[in-house]
Regions:
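Small beta-barrel nucleic-acid-binding modules, primarily SNase/OB-fold domains
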Residues: 2-14, 18-27, 31-244
Length: 244
């Protein structure tokens, strides 16, 4: 459409000018949308080096080792620790989580897909969404069956975060896996304080909550509310039940 401006002598040309202005506005809006696109969503489409691999072993419920010696941390999820910060005991459901991961992938071929801005964590482990041979997301499957929980991060692909958040809500509602007993433990009835900036939550008596800015604080009446909101437990002040 040619850009024709309104003229008092040729009023019929005003409509063409309107179309030109609308086209220019649409192009400007599309350009602004591209600038506003989250970096994580663009990075998530990038291929990781050597994406095809075979799993050799599983260290726990969220970390595995490939036959080419690479160690992969499943992005966007976390599983109970086999060696709890409070001591040598395992956290509740840690052994079951490792078993669930092992049964799904040990000795099998997988595909690694970038999950966000960063490809490696501070420990040198590859961060990835792992796809099974049928195309199913391993990260999402573990959360959906209650073998792991959603662990949000600003660098993570927004699309992956939304899928994991939805899978967790489904698992909680159905009381699958770790949710079957965790939400009936005394810790489930305690109150928690979340940080809107980090998307982590803490027991309200944790000293670390004093460092959360008032505008970033969100209160949860119980444990389920915190998880349903998409927050994850902070590393400090661990409250997860332990097993011998």
């Amino acid at each position: 459409v040619p850009c024709v401006f309104p003229s008092p002598r040729r009023p019929g040309l005003y409509r063409g000018g309107q179309r030109c202005a609308a086209l220019a506005a649409a192009l400007l809006w599309a350009w602004l949308c591209m600038l506003a696109l989250p970096v994580g969503s663009m990075a998530a489409s990038e291929a990781l080096p050597r994406p095809q691999a075979t799993v050799a072993r599983c260290f726990d419920g969220d970390t595995l080792k490939l036959t080419d010696r690479r160690v992969v941390r499943l992005a966007g999820i976390d599983a109970p620790e086999l060696h709890a910060p409070q001591g040598d005991k395992a956290q509740y459901y840690a052994r079951e989580a490792r078993k669930a991961l092992t049964e799904r992938v040990r000795g099998r071929k997988v595909t690694l897909r970038a999950a966000g801005v960063k490809h490696k964590d501070p420990h040198g482990r590859w961060l990835a969404e792992v796809l099974l041979e049928d195309g199913e997301s391993l990260n999402e499957a573990l959360v959906r069956e209650g073998a792991a929980f959603f662990y949000p991060h600003r660098d993570l692909s927004p699309q992956l975060q939304e899928r994991l958040r939805a899978a967790q809500r489904e698992a909680i509602a159905a009381k699958r896996g770790l949710w079957a007993q965790l939400l009936s433990q005394p810790v489930a009835q305690a109150t928690y304080l979340g940080n809107k900036e980090s998307l982590r939550f803490f027991p309200t008596d944790c000293a670390a909550v004093q460092h959360i800015k008032p505008r970033n604080r969100v209160y949860f009446g119980n444990l389920m509310d915190a998880f349903m909101a998409g927050y994850a437990p902070a590393r400090v002040c661990p409250f997860w039940p332990l097993v011998p």
